[in-house]
């Protein structure tokens, strides 16, 4: 039996992240090596020519899994029948701008794209918001796409999760594939809390706690956390452009694990709609440790939370509650 192609929407597809992401999707990195895809690429009218150039390159690459490409500036056409939507398009924060300066623009973008997904997307469409402020953009999308189940609307904190794994693997000179179960709690912003308490590394003599192996609490509670929190800014400083390759790769990881499942005994970080687990405020999109099976994510329950973690989890939660209020004030 031939496998039916899945339709994958990428918004902001002519941009940096989009350009890194679409070949990964077309190669099967996101949905697996046996899953054909039809790419739907959306961008704004000033980017229409560049978008067409990306479409030409996708045709030229002759990807066996790529069964079609829709490149458009029309949001209704872009959303028609999509099974997965990766929302990369948004109004970027420029130098000297605060989060609150871009909020009104992003609220209006996500309100209109939510309405289009609500009307045209496939019934069980899975949505991943990448554009910043990602958690709050996802919350606005949830508000204006009421028929998409809330569990299907997520935001990207896998990039932060992967950054944390990378820092630990470098510090311990270990393979990154041997490091697991770090947690990103909260907002995809510099208030996020990268938590290594449950994190382990596979060694020659079994799995060991990262805290024990690193044996340097000052680094783990200090520089490690700030490096992960501020990694995006460090990349902008080095490249003069924001992280695109790593963002695209982690977006593929997020969707792949969500659709195909997480390995036994391993969890990942995803921004999901809070149900109040771990005394996190309900009604915001917050990053939790989750396991995935059969296309569904589930928050990992019962992890011990010490006092330091509690404070950091509360602080990032408070920032999200504040962002939510700011976003809602833009709607009136």
Swiss-Prot record:
Gene3D superfamilies, alphabetized: Lactate dehydrogenase/glycoside hydrolase, family 4, C-terminal, NAD(P)-binding Rossmann-like Domain
Keyword annotations: Cytoplasm, NAD, Oxidoreductase, Tricarboxylic acid cycle
Active site: 188
Substrates-to-products reaction catalysed: (S)-malate + NAD(+) = oxaloacetate + NADH + H(+)
Top-level taxon of the source organism: Eukaryota
InterPro entries per record: L-lactate/malate_DH, Lactate/malate_DH_C, Lactate/malate_DH_N, Lactate_DH/Glyco_Ohase_4_C, Malate_DH_AS, Malate_DH_NAD-dep_euk, Malate_DH_type2, NAD(P)-bd_dom_sf
GO terms, biological process: malate metabolic process; tricarboxylic acid cycle
Residues reported to bind oxaloacetate: 99, 132, 163, 188, 243
Main location: cytoplasm
Quaternary structure note: Homodimer.
The protein's name in its UniProt record: Malate dehydrogenase, cytoplasmic
Organism expressing this protein natively: Beta vulgaris
Lineage per the UniProt record: Eukaryota, Viridiplantae, Streptophyta, Embryophyta, Tracheophyta
Name of the gene encoding the protein in the UniProt record: NR1
